[in-house]
Amino acid sequence: MSTDKTDVKMGVLRIYLDGAYGIGKTTAAEEFLHHFAITPNRILLIGEPLSYWRNLAGEDAICGIYGTQTRRLNGDVSPEDAQRLTAHFQSLFCSPHAIMHAKISALMDTSTSDLVQVNKEPYKIMLSDRHPIASTICFPLSRYLVGDMSPAALPGLLFTLPAEPPGTNLVVCTVSLPSHLSRVSKRARPGETVNLPFVMVLRNVYIMLINTIIFLKTNNWHAGWNTLSFCNDVFKQKLQKSECIKLREVPGIEDTLFAVLKLPELCGEFGNILPLWAWGMETLSNCLRSMSPFVLSLEQTPQHAAQELKTLLPQMTPANMSSGAWNILKELVNAVQDNTS
């Protein structure tokens, strides 16, 4: 494998398509790739590490996490043991994404000066099907909110995130609830089940994620922390039953993930977050603050979504990468995908 990273500096757009499962992200990403296929070596698509999830040291994370909920409902496992098993299987989703993300980060030119302009073509595009925060933030929080995981599992996932390199463009994909339920029921991945409360919570959490990133551009997490009520069962039920979180141009802290993270288990007797978890909250905030957030509707055809994504490109934050590093990245991605085919 080549190790030359000193070639010509290039402008690169790192784009991460994310959102709830089963809405058509992968199809939209493939359509976007097809759109740019006329320009060789222009775009690199990084797919979900599905086969790693299917066989991680002999364990199937997808069947395991959904199967655990079925076993709990059938009374085959206690609620407490089900929460522990869910936390275990959720952790299996994290490692393939995290390792790949670390390799990508190491290849980036993190200097903030002299950014290569990407408003003049050609420039490179790295399009990833999900960002690691899907498995470390959004899905674990959603599992907790429906009772599938205990709060004890959250700090190790949410508060230990690595620093995010410059130029992360996070595109949260959305569809209407009827379209979502129709699509996820049709794709029928082995072991995957449709749980309406979980789907509803996940949709709310992704809107909270966007609100959180916007909020952190001008605020700190502790601004308004004391005004938040503890995340209680009433709030959890509301998140499970309706799309109660709205996308805000100017979010308040109550519109963000911090409204979920105000947990008695993380706080002292007066509601102040314990020092260790406060440091973790800073780590989480720094990671999210550095991202550029976008929203993309997948309600219409994949072709329409690809065109809409293209219109967002001029608004995105570029990064630098050498041509040698780009070639290394292609080799890495091809090696992983060859091993997962």
Curated annotation (Swiss-Prot):
Annotated substrate binding sites: 66, 90, 189
Catalytic reactions of this protein: thymidine + ATP = dTMP + ADP + H(+)
Keyword Cell cycle annotated: no
Record-annotated active site: 48 (proton acceptor)
Pfam families: Herpes_TK
InterPro entries named in the record: Herpes_TK, P-loop_NTPase
Name listed for the protein in its UniProt record: Thymidine kinase
Organism of derivation: Varicella-zoster virus (strain Oka vaccine)
